[in-house]
From Swiss-Prot:
Gene responsible for this protein: ndhJ
Reactions performed catalytically: a plastoquinone + NADH + (n+1) H(+)(in) = a plastoquinol + NAD(+) + n H(+)(out); a plastoquinone + NADPH + (n+1) H(+)(in) = a plastoquinol + NADP(+) + n H(+)(out)
Key word Cell membrane present: no
Source organism, top-level taxon: Bacteria
Listed name of the protein: NAD(P)H-quinone oxidoreductase subunit J
Signal sequence annotation: none
Cited InterPro entries: NADH_DH_suC, NADH_quin_OxRdtase_su_C/D-like, NADH_UbQ_OxRdtase_30kDa_su, NADH_UbQ_OxRdtase_CS
Gene3D superfamilies on file: NADH:ubiquinone oxidoreductase, 30kDa subunit
Pfam families to which the protein is assigned, alphabetical: Complex1_30kDa
Organism for this UniProt entry: Synechococcus elongatus (strain ATCC 33912 / PCC 7942 / FACHB-805) (Anacystis nidulans R2)
Length: 172
């Protein structure tokens, strides 16, 4: 009797949602990922096509960047920059939402800034840079926002080693 293969989350086929289908129909490469626990559609895109896809989604009505953030998949694995977008309209009782994810190699965590599409990305991209070291190319003021400017490393990376001592400088 042949052995049956049980799909894992990495190999399971995910049905493309309406946003993923719209992107594909309009020539934008993307991969549909499993929806989150609230049913929000998630699409994965390559960093090289993030800006054209972001501009297309803005034109499609996703005019509000609800959240931009990052996370670390683990030591030696990718970093992820994500964008939670919402269609804000007159009928906002059930706004459409989508989350866009860009997986970045740990040794080269660079992605274009979406600041020029959604101004709200300003501080959010700075925080993601400060905590994970993801470089947002084209950001007008990419510098640390939470940690001291001379801080070494990226505190929320899973391979980060905390310094034994850090001396705060007096403000005067």
């Amino acid at each position: 009797m042949p052995e049956e293969l049980t799909p894992t989350p990495e190999t399971a086929v995910v049905e493309a949602g309406p946003v993923s289908r719209w992107l594909s129909e309009n020539g934008f490469e993307n991969t549909a990922l499993e929806r989150d626990h609230l049913g929000v559609e998630i699409v994965q895109v390559d960093r090289e096509v993030l800006l054209p896809i972001a501009a297309a989604l803005f034109a499609y009505g996703f005019n509000y960047l609800q959240c931009q953030g990052g996370y670390d998949l683990g030591p030696g694995q990718d970093l992820v920059s994500f964008y939670h977008l919402t269609k804000v309209s007159d009928d906002a009782s059930q706004p459409q939402e989508v989350r866009v994810k860009v997986f970045l190699p740990r040794h080269d965590p660079k992605v274009p800034s979406v600041f020029w599409i959604w101004k709200g990305a300003d501080w959010q991209e700075r925080e993601t840079f400060d905590m994970y070291g993801i470089q947002f190319e084209g950001h007008p003021n990419l510098k640390r926002i939470l940690m001291p400017e001379d801080w070494v490393g990226w505190p929320l990376r899973k391979d980060y080693i905390s310094p034994d001592f850090y001396e705060l400088q007096d403000a005067y």
